[in-house]
Amino acid sequence: MIQAEPFEARLVAVRPLSPFVRELSFERADGKAFLFEAGQWVNLVLPLPGGEVKRAYSIASAPDGSPRFDLAVTRVEGGAGSEYLHRLEPGATLRAVGPHGLFTRDPGSPAPSLFVATGTGVTPLRSMLRASLRAGAAAHLWILFGARFEEDIIYRDELEALARGSDRIRYEITLSRGGPSWSGRRGYVQAHVPELYRELAGASGDPAPHVFICGLDRMVSLVRELARGELGVPRKHVHVERYD
């Protein structure tokens, strides 16, 4: 287990992922490698007018031994922390503490996995996917991503390209409020989990793929109960990360 430690983080790049989500790329200001496991998170210490606050963000990038790491931040109206981060420009520095978290996956594991996410819950799963590809693992990794509107989909082009480039990666999107032009899946993620889980078991030849679930608490609870109940997924094969 990598020990969490405090360090100064410098913002080096910003890019929009959706109308409300920005990717913030940081690096350790001391130039040391930022060591973490795919799926972990980091605390940022924000100097707000009312006093310092800590905000936790999952790491979207895969470990590569460099000082750099990426975070995806949703701007919440009236949310002082997210609005502060959305105003930051490259060159700004913040105190950070990390890495933290047990929501991890061995990048070299051949075990098939269904990744289920909504919103920025896809970020630690993106990290796991990229870490597995870097390790050359032969795992079937399927992603089910849920959003309200098409404009809310983040990392879409990247994940679609990865899926096109490998017969072991599948990327599915479902929209709860998709417009008339949307031709993909509709509804909430839990409506599609049973079908995809059973298909993954058949495609991989493994009767009990792992399930990694990340997003808001209610979705995580519903999918976890579905996996453990209707689908009979072994307890040790169900992994969750809940966002407030």
Curated annotation (Swiss-Prot):
Annotated residues for binding of FAD: 55-58, 120
Entries under InterPro entries matching the protein: Cbr1-like_FAD-bd_dom (IPR008333), FAD-bd_FR_type (IPR017927), Flavoprot_Pyr_Nucl_cyt_Rdtase (IPR001709), FNR_nucleotide-bd (IPR039261), MRET (IPR050415), OxRdtase_FAD/NAD-bd (IPR001433), Riboflavin_synthase-like_b-brl (IPR017938)
Stretches that traverse the bilayer: none
Entry keyword Flavoprotein: yes
UniProt keywords, alphabetically: FAD, Flavoprotein, NADP, Nucleotide-binding, Oxidoreductase
EC number: 1.18.1.2
Keyword set includes Calcium: no
Swiss-Prot/TrEMBL cofactor(s): FAD
EC supergroup of this enzyme: oxidoreductase
GO terms assigned for molecular function: nucleotide binding; oxidoreductase activity
Domain FAD-binding FR-type: 4-106
Reaction equation(s) it catalyzes: 2 reduced [4Fe-4S]-[ferredoxin] + NADP(+) + H(+) = 2 oxidized [4Fe-4S]-[ferredoxin] + NADPH
Main function: Transports electrons between NADPH and ferredoxin. Can transfer electrons to ferredoxins Fdx2 and Fdx8. Prefers NADPH to NADH.
Family: Belongs to the ferredoxin--NADP reductase type 1 family.
PANTHER family membership: NADH OXIDOREDUCTASE HCR, PROTEIN RFBI
UniProt-recorded name of the protein: Ferredoxin--NADP reductase B
Provenance organism: Sorangium cellulosum (strain So ce56) (Polyangium cellulosum (strain So ce56))
Highest classification ranks of the organism: Bacteria, Pseudomonadati, Myxococcota, Polyangia, Polyangiales
